[in-house]
């Protein structure tokens, strides 16, 4: 393949001369599908990360969100509720025949979500290409995000089919065991995969999975992501779905992968696991901290907005950024 292989922990970005007086001057906003959002972060469309209330709060506060698809019968009402509140609607769909019926029902009733994410584990598939074409045919005004993929060929195929953005990452997530169960994926080289795919992309890329620190958001931007999808770091909040558990005086919340037994309710083709994540307090505090850290990243990059990060030099420090800890 002749490409550099690295992941988040292998990279350090190199600072440039600072041109702003305070990090609060740094602009972290990003545009996607004709809307501008506060930060280039989207909570994972997983049942332990997002629900109706969180989606509504995010949209009201200028954050991007993608609603999960694990209560499919509620999606039409969700879109109508969001539109009634004069908010944008952003939903997920799969590729089964019932999903075609759902899309056709929306089209017939002129219920048009602003964003539709076609979300399956192996997104470089004829089934995904067919669904992109169908949505673009009957709901041409919806912005279509398709995934998940791991290669430039996949990005090109989905973009050529009509996708407006692609989601990159197969199995690097904390609650994902695709890498262990199948031997396939971007676990351990997710950031290099983002870079590889971004070089081929003509449209935005969403880096999905493997982000463990706020600095990883800046690294994703550096290597070509427009938006970064975050699961485990945005789970475990006061508002998050899932039960609060106390163990040995510590507080946790449940977190599970989208193809886990807990999610599916059956032990078949399981590629996700259930785990506990530390209780993290209020979601707004975490999102504010992400924004502040990204503002600091911009100031280190020597610029005023996210574009500055894309021009930074970097070094590859094979697994050693934590060596001093």
Curated annotation (Swiss-Prot):
Give the keywords, sorted.
NADP, Oxidoreductase
Active-site residues annotated for this sequence: 176
Known function: Catalyzes the irreversible NADPH-dependent deamination of GMP to IMP. It functions in the conversion of nucleobase, nucleoside and nucleotide derivatives of G to A nucleotides, and in maintaining the intracellular balance of A and G nucleotides.
Instruction: Supply the Gene3D superfamilies for this chain.
Output: Aldolase class I (3.20.20.70)
Catalyzed chemical reaction(s): IMP + NH4(+) + NADP(+) = GMP + NADPH + 2 H(+)
* Entry-linked PROSITE patterns: IMP_DH_GMP_RED
What are the protein's GO molecular function terms? GMP reductase activity
Q: Which organism is it from?
A: Lactiplantibacillus plantarum (strain ATCC BAA-793 / NCIMB 8826 / WCFS1)
Q: What is this protein called?
A: GMP reductase
GO CC: one term? cytosol
The catalytic activity of this protein is classed by the Enzyme Commission as 1.7.1.7
Keyword DNA-binding: yes or no? no
Origin, by domain of life? Bacteria
Q: Does the keyword Ion transport apply?
A: no
| Residues the record lists as binding NADP(+) | 205-228
Q: Which family does it belong to?
A: Belongs to the IMPDH/GMPR family. GuaC type 2 subfamily.
Query: Which GO terms of type biological process are on file?
Result: purine nucleotide metabolic process
The record, for InterPro entries, names: Aldolase_TIM (IPR013785), GMP_reductase (IPR050139), GuaC_type_2 (IPR005994), IMP_DH/GMP_Rdtase_CS (IPR015875), IMP_DH_GMPRt (IPR001093)
């Amino acid at each position: 393949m002749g490409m550099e292989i690295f992941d988040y922990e292998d990279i350090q970005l190199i600072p440039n001369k600072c041109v702003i007086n305070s990090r609060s001057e740094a602009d972290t906003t990003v545009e996607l599908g004709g809307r501008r959002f506060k930060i280039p972060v989207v909570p994972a469309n997983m049942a332990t990360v997002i629900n109706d209330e969180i989606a509504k709060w995010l949209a009201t506060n200028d954050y991007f969100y993608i609603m999960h698809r694990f209560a499919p019968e509620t999606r039409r009402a969700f879109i109508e509720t969001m539109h009634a509140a004069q908010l944008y609607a952003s939903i997920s769909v799969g590729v089964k025949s019932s999903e075609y019926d759902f899309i056709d029902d929306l089209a017939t009733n002129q219920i048009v979500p602003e964003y539709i994410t076609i979300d399956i584990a192996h997104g470089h598939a004829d089934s995904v290409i067919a669904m992109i074409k169908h949505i673009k045919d009957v709901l041409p005004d919806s912005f279509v995000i398709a995934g998940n993929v791991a290669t430039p060929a996949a990005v090109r195929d989905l973009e050529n089919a009509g996708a407006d953005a692609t989601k990159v990452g197969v199995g690097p997530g904390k609650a994902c065991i695709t890498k262990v169960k199948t031997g396939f994926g971007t676990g351990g080289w997710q950031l290099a995969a983002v870079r590889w795919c971004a070089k081929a992309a003509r449209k935005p890329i969403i880096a999905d999975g493997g982000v463990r620190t706020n600095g990883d958001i800046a690294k994703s931007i550096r290597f070509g992501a427009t938006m970064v999808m975050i699961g485990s770091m945005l789970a475990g909040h006061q508002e998050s779905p899932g039960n609060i558990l106390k163990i040995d005086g510590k507080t946790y919340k449940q977190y599970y992968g989208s193809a886990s037994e807990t999610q599916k309710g059956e032990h078949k083709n399981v590629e996700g696991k259930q785990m506990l994540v530390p209780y993290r307090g209020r979601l707004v505090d975490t999102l504010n901290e992400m924004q502040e850290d990204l503002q600091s990243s911009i100031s280190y990059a020597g610029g005023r907005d996210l574009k500055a990060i894309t021009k930074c030099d970097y070094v590859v420090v094979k697994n050693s950024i934590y060596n001093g800890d």
